[in-house]
């Protein structure tokens, strides 16, 4: 199944946010040569149970990773921030603030968003490590 970029389901959108956050963390860790799990991966179960509260925690933690990626000349960070913004704009305010557990649909959004990373694009967007998107 391909990523549905205009699908507005709360669970699907939260899954997409988690995938983008994980991507930012992964690439920041790769730049510094760190070999550990991302916060997004470690907090996935908590995220499924309390998405609004856990997203706030993850988003605050992203700042230090984004600082590491500032030195990247590829536009990777700008693209990820834009992606986060586009996903956040699709939320209904009440859905975004709803801390009820997510259904399995969040995993669909998560994996479809992650798969987008490996799809072939004709753009020149690359990761900080030079990997083509």
Predicted features along the sequence, with ranges:
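Intrinsic-disorder/low-complexity detector
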Residues: 1-133
């Amino acid at each position: 199944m391909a990523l549905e970029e205009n699908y507005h389901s709360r669970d699907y959108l939260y899954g997409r946010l988690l995938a983008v956050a994980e991507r930012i963390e992964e690439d920041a860790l790769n730049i510094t040569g760190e070999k550990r799990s991302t916060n997004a991966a470690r907090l996935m179960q908590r995220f499924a149970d309390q998405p609004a509260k856990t997203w706030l925690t993850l988003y605050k933690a992203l700042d230090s990773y984004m600082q590491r990626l500032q030195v990247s000349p590829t536009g990777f960070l700008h693209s990820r921030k834009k992606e986060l913004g586009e996903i956040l704009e699709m939320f209904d305010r009440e859905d975004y603030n709803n801390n009820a557990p997510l259904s399995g649909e969040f995993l669909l959004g998560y994996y479809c968003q992650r798969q987008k990373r490996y799809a072939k694009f004709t753009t020149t967007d690359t990761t900080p490590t030079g990997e083509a998107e």
